[in-house]
Design a protein with these regions (language model features):
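Central cavity-lining transmembrane alpha-helices of secondary-active solute carriers
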Residues: 52-70, 259-271
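Cytoplasmic helix-loop-helix junction between adjacent transmembrane helices
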Residues: 107-144
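Intracellular juxtamembrane helix-capping segments at the cytosolic ends
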Residues: 117-131, 320-335
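Helix-loop-helix hairpin linking two adjacent transmembrane segments in secondary transporters
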Residues: 133, 137-194
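Extracytoplasmic
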Residues: 14-45, 123, 235-240
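Helix-breaking motifs and short loop linkers at transmembrane-helix boundaries and internal kinks
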Residues: 44, 76, 97-102, 248, ...
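Conserved MFS/SLC helix-loop-helix module at the cytosolic interface between two early adjacent transmembrane helices
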Residues: 63-102
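Extracytoplasmic gate region of multi-pass secondary transporters
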Residues: 32-33, 214-259, 263-269
Length: 392
């Protein structure tokens, strides 16, 4: 191996590692499902009230995603990611002051704003390091790193709630402090990393960004992202409630259902990074959606632990690569408008607001079977989207 090749690989690793740590920080938003269940228990909230937390987090994706695409055109993708990390760190320190309803609303709002900015800017930043034929697999690996943070959240929260070690009286909220410190580390490493960016010829207006939705495939992809994140947040939040409703387990035990989901989502992201280099995105997407459909059927029909865990695992694995395939398809389809399309795709994460709200009302009306029915609608749409996927 030549010295120049070794130098290039070393340079690439020095740039990609800080970016992957940012993907880990991106996963902090998934603590909202775990946190909302603990807050619901602490404050005695209804399902509809508790589901306001994840809905509030993802509401900000609707507001901030497109303006972030415009901000990237002005200050660059890396600087925009740094801003998002600062906002995220601030949001994670807020719960150290208490767990009242207003404090948690403020924390989740800032967490949503920071994550909206981060997801809009970090995903296209990868295109400055990776060629288009490796984009889907690299984004999937980033989602794998993100999923590790998601998987650890319920474990850290449960440890904080039950440990005899001193956690400054925070209990399960020690989760926020640990993730805040990691956010500060990500800020330091990314700020010290040099990344060359391709600058746009001209800045875009909000109208020009939204105009991209007039392109049929971009609109279909936008709706696909909405369904993906709705299923993701919905399963994250609802899985423990299904266990509690049907088996009567306490939250500390039922919360393992969220861990099952993220274990399989993490495994799916890791394997997907390699599978997407071997088979077409369309075939892998179809297999993933069918796995979710089977998983939803198990959640709807079963009332014992093993099949419920199986269904949750199938949904986690199936949903693990949906985002990466849709996002990469959209970026390659509109390669001349990457920042704008990125903003629109991340705006689709607003589905994380729509789905939990609908699921909360459905669950209050007919039980958790109503929440499962709402998520199944999203899975059926993704089955339709499979037919529209292009070959890259």
């Amino acid at each position: 191996m030549s010295q120049s090749l070794i130098t290039r690989r070393k340079s690439f690793l020095l740039r990609i590692i800080p970016v992957m740590l940012c993907f880990f920080a991106m996963g902090f938003v998934d603590l909202v499902g775990t946190a909302s269940n603990y807050v619901q228990q602490d404050l005695g909230l209804t399902d509809a009230q508790a589901n306001l937390f994840p809905s509030l987090v993802f509401f900000w994706f609707l507001i901030f995603s497109v303006p972030t695409g415009m901000l990237m055109n002005k200050i660059g993708r890396k600087n925009t990611v740094l801003i998002s990390l600062v906002v995220t760190a601030v949001s994670l320190f807020i719960p150290t002051f208490g767990d009242s309803y207003l404090i948690m609303l403020a924390s989740f709002s800032l967490l949503g704003i920071g994550n909206a900015i981060m997801q809009t800017s970090l995903n296209p930043l990868i295109t400055n390091l990776i060629s288009s034929d490796r984009l889907a697999s690299t984004l999937t690996f980033g989602q794998f790193v993100k999923a590790i943070a998601s998987f650890l959240a319920p474990i850290i929260a449960a440890w904080g709630a039950t440990t005899l070690l001193p956690v400054f009286g925070l209990g399960w909220r020690v989760l926020f402090v640990i993730y805040a410190v990691i956010s500060l580390l990500a800020i330091s490493l990314l700020a010290a990393t040099s990344i060359e960016e391709d600058r746009p010829v001209a800045a875009s207006s909000i109208g020009q960004c939204l105009k991209q939705l007039g392109r049929p495939f971009i609109l279909l992809s936008f709706l696909g992202i909405m369904c993906h994140v709705g299923i993701d947040v919905g399963t994250n939040t609802t899985a423990p409630k299904i266990i509690i409703e049907r088996l009567g387990l306490p939250l500390e035990d039922a919360g393992f259902a969220t861990g099952i989901y993220f274990i399989f989502r993490t495994i799916g992201c890791f394997l997907g990074a390699f599978i997407l280099r071997a088979i077409s995105p369309k075939l892998f997407f179809a297999i993933s959606v069918l796995m979710m459909l089977v998983g939803m059927s198990l959640l709807a029909l079963c009332d014992t632990l093993a099949p419920l865990y199986t269904g949750i695992g199938l949904i986690g694995f199936g949903n693990s690569n949906i985002f990466s395939v849709i996002f990469s398809q959209a970026l390659v389809y509109a390669s001349d408008k990457k920042n704008e399309v990125s903003g629109l795709m991340i705006m689709g994460l607003f589905g994380g607001t729509v789905f939990p709200l609908a699921m909360g009302y459905a669950a209050d009306a007919v039980g958790q079977i109503g929440a499962v029915a709402v998520m199944t609608v999203g899975v059926l749409y993704l089955l339709y989207y499979t037919l529209k996927i292009k070959k890259i």
